[in-house]
Structures are given as structure tokens and as C-alpha cells.
Amino acid sequence: AAYALPQEVAWGEKNCRTAYLYAVTTHPDFRKRGICAKLLAYAEKELTKRYFDCLTLVPATDALRSYYASLGFVSQNTAFFDEGGAPEARGVCEVLTPAEYAGLRETVLYDLPHVRYGLSDLRYQASMSGFYRLELGSHFGCACAHPDGETLVVDEILPDCSVLPALLKQLPAKQCRVRTVGGSAPFAMCKWLSDAHMPDVYLAFDFG
């Protein structure tokens, strides 16, 4: 089985249609028969006919990453930081609605190729994490985060970790695990179906 979630990739004034593939699974009794490859080939064919420009997914393991690479998917980089001890809380942190977060996020990411999330995507993400506006001195940003015991899991912080202390004002924690744009850690994978190719697309949420 596989599911395709329609999304949009944006870069400045450019945008194109993408399908986020998730829950790609083969029953254990039918593995190693090429069924997954045939399923993805069928999805690619059908989505191309529907004028989608690319496919994105997030592999759960390194072995799956290698497998998807053999099918033409290319890893897109992002940055992960295990901060260890959380920084001292300082600055201003305000709770945002999904609509408010969408607007602020697009402003911050305007110059970078990224997946633009619709309100339905963000409302689903809001069932797992909160959205926040951050201010620290002259620095402004936004974040999506949730506590996990004594660790603050930051699903996204923009434009970078410079505004992380402000997030701790709303969500105190002893440790932080952070994802942000840039860096060289492989995360999402992308396969282009058209000539609307964009470099290193940033995808934040795997909706896992």
C-alpha cells in the first residue's frame, strides 16, 4: 500500500506540485518480489499524468534510503542538532494558530526551495505539536515543537537555532532535539517528474 498527499514546493515566486508518499508498505509474505518497485512505478506514472512535478518521501531507515535511491530518489539535506542541555530561556514566545504559522513560515523560507504546507497539513501537525512565534533581541523566527518527557522535540525552528532560547520561555526543558533548514544530514528524498527541478528541497514534517 502507499498513500500520496498532494503538496506544493515553493521557491520565491516559483511553485510546483508535489506528492508526499507515505505509509509505503508491503505485506511481509510478499516482500522481495519487486512489488514495492512496481507500486512506486505505477504511482509515478499516474501522478505524472495528473501533472505532478515531483515525489517526496521520508525513509524510515538507511536501508530504505538506499533502496529508494536505487529507484531514482535523491536525498535532500537538512540540519539536525542534539543540543544536549537546553539553553537558558530568554526572549519572547507567542503561541500561533496554524494559519498564522503558515504565513510567518512562508515569509522566512521565501528564498529557499521548500515544501509549502496547506492549512489541512498544519492542522494535522498541530495535533502533535504547537506553533510559536519567537523573538530574541533583533532576531525573529518561528518554531513547531512538543515536549517529550524532559526533552523538547523541535520539529522545525526557523530561520535557525539563534532563536531557540525564546522557545524555552513557553516550553521549558532540560534537553532539546532540533531540526532546522540547511546542514548536511539526509532527511527527505525527492524524485523529479518534470523539468521544474529545484535544488535541495527542505521538507520539515514527516507526519509520523
Locations of regions flagged by a protein language model:
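Structural motif
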Residues: 155-160, 178-184
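Conserved acetyl-CoA-binding loop-helix of GNAT-fold acetyltransferases
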Residues: 23-26, 32-45, 70, 159-172
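Amide-forming acyltransferase catalytic core, primarily the GNAT-like/NAT-type
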Residues: 71-156, 161-162
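Conserved GNAT acetyl-CoA-binding A-motif
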Residues: 40, 47-60, 173-183
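C-terminal functional modules
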Residues: 185-208
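Core nucleotidyl-transferase/polymerase catalytic module
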Residues: 5, 22-23, 43, 61-63, ...
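Conserved active-site alpha-helix within GNAT-family acetyltransferase domains
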Residues: 52-54, 60-78, 183-193
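Conserved beta-strand in the GNAT
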Residues: 1-7, 18-20, 25, 56, ...
